[in-house]
Amino acid sequence: TEAEIAALKQYTDNGGKVILCSKSDRDNKYDNCAENSNALLTAIGAHSRIVNGIIVDNDLKANEAYRLYLSSKENFNTGHPFTAGAYTSSNAFGTTPATDNQTGFQLYNGGPVEVLDESKVQVLVRGYQSTWGTHYDGYFDGSSFVPEYDESVDGRVTVKKGDVNVMTYEDLPGGGWVITSGVTFFSNYDIKSDQDYANRFILRNILNSLKPAGTVTKIADVHKAAEKEEFTVEGTVTANASGYDKNT
């Protein structure tokens, strides 16, 4: 509602941080997810938008054109703190992208993310060179659909091959930030501890960034304290770090 958007704008104007997750136009019968998402993104001064369409890939899909596992290093912005280590820590590390390779960043029923200003927005997760955007409604029903890439058909291609963004990050005018994702990347199925999808490591990086910084205690004071007390220290470890032998 307009009141909810106004409340979120006030929140971000005061430095609030937002994760916006949207979806594709699949089953968009009663509401337009892209339209609703973009109304909020516009209000808070963001430079990313959700494309009204669906992310597909005929070459590297799983059992459906819109179920993808992004398992290549090139899919991740390894230089950003939110995605740093997500690829190497995930079950995709050391594998080769293939239709039967269900590793990496799990994406199902996602909408593409458009970047309006590349100088202000960083792409965190992107598709393959064979990934593109189309419309669900009116083209197919279920997993039987094999979308035909044809730019000459009006409205068939919403995002060209190789240009699909899945998740972006940008700083907001109020001092906070917004992550714009075309998919809810942290559902229970995406962050299961026994699967090691990249989704879980990205979420962990984000949550760790939100934790308050601990009070740093001088190492000399820690030496004087009783055992089993917890402290935050800064220093350089050279050897025997695990032995806790003060005499070495």
Where do the protein language model's features map onto the residues?
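Short alpha-beta junction capping motif
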Residues: 1-42, 175, 181
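A generic secondary-structure signal marking the coil-to-beta-strand transition
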Residues: 120-122, 175-179, 229
